[in-house]
From Swiss-Prot:
Residues 52-75 are annotated as: Disordered. Belongs to the Tlp family. InterPro entries: SASP_thioredoxin-like (IPR017524). The gene is tlp. HAMAP family: Tlp. This is Protein Tlp homolog. It comes from the Bacteria.
Length: 75
């Protein structure tokens, strides 16, 4: 089996897509939190949003690295 070559040309786009979707998920969860009276659901969604925000920090760092590498020709 041949390994695929490392093609990173669209990594920035993929990461940006994931950032956008994660932000949308956070906003949707915030809407549910505001509307629901179910404390268990609120707690679960708040915890999930905390993890999402941590993931966003990591993705933002990763996109900076990828953008820099893309600019430098992926050396």
């Amino acid at each position: 089996m041949k390994n695929k070559p490392d093609d990173r040309r669209d990594n920035v786009d993929k990461i940006q897509y994931n950032i956008t979707k994660t932000i949308q998920n956070c906003e949707f969860a915030d809407e549910i939190i505001a509307k629901t009276d179910d404390e268990k659901t609120k707690k679960t969604l708040i915890e999930k949003n905390e993890r999402r925000r941590e993931a966003l920090d990591g993705m933002r760092e990763e996109i900076k690295d990828e953008a820099r590498d893309k600019k430098n020709g992926y050396m």
